[in-house]
């Protein structure tokens, strides 16, 4: 019953019905208090959230950013603790602690949501890719962006970032496919994800691929009012 409702969500996204959003800025405190922000209801151990994180960050080499802020990934590493294991259970748990701004076409849609989710998951230590392609559902098709996350066992999962937007919030079903290949078409019931190209960082989408290039305004999730505190840190604003 709920699965059919899930696919209704993605249809709504494609026809771009906006349900509105309350403009309250997310703060560093809200992000770092991940357990209190959106407490999962499926963890049996109340100390689970403390047990999945390392007590220190692993050393990292941050990608060089050309158009994006230079401290882009350094900031996410600072904000989010590294997980001990990058497995499906941990990823599922982390996704349940994330609530992104409301979806609105051409303002904060699949591209901004995917970029922000990729940034957050990289901060937690997950190897994450952004995938651009076509989403066909119920006979309607359109350009779309989603996230692919690589796990420690080498497998990859497809994550639908818009299911974490507050007006389409459905985190239990954000993981669409659990044995994903970046180059393969994925068909899940009436949804078909057709990849065109993928990238390690959103910065790479500003370079033309197959005659397609994104504008920075299509990816600048930090300009949403709810991300105002992050923007201040990212750009050293007072």
Swiss-Prot record:
InterPro entries: Papain-like_cys_pep_sf. It comes from the Archaea. SUPFAM superfamilies: Cysteine proteinases. This is Uncharacterized protein MJ0834. It comes from Methanocaldococcus jannaschii (strain ATCC 43067 / DSM 2661 / JAL-1 / JCM 10045 / NBRC 100440) (Methanococcus jannaschii).
């Amino acid at each position: 019953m709920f699965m059919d409702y899930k696919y209704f969500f993605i249809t709504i996204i494609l026809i771009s019905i906006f349900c509105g959003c309350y403009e309250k800025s997310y703060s560093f405190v809200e992000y770092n208090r991940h357990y209190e922000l959106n407490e999962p209801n499926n963890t049996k151990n109340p100390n689970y959230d403390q047990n999945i994180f390392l007590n220190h960050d692993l050393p990292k080499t941050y990608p060089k950013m050309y158009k994006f802020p230079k401290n882009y990934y350094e900031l996410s590493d600072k904000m989010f603790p590294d997980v001990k294991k990058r497995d499906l259970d941990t990823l599922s748990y982390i996704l349940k602690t994330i609530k992104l701004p409301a979806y609105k076409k051409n303002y904060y849609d699949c591209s901004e949501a995917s970029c922000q989710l990729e940034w957050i998951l990289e901060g937690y230590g997950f190897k994450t890719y952004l995938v651009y392609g076509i989403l066909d559902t119920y006979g309607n098709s359109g350009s779309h962006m989603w996230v692919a996350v690589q796990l420690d066992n080498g497998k990859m999962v497809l994550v639908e970032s818009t299911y974490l937007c507050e007006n389409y919030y459905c985190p239990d079903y954000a993981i669409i496919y659990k044995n994903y290949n970046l180059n393969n078409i994925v068909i899940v019931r009436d949804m078909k994800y057709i990849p065109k190209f993928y990238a390690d960082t959103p910065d790479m989408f500003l370079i033309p691929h197959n005659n397609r290039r994104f504008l920075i305004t299509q990816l600048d999730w930090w300009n949403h009012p709810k991300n105002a505190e992050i923007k201040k840190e990212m750009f050293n604003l007072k």
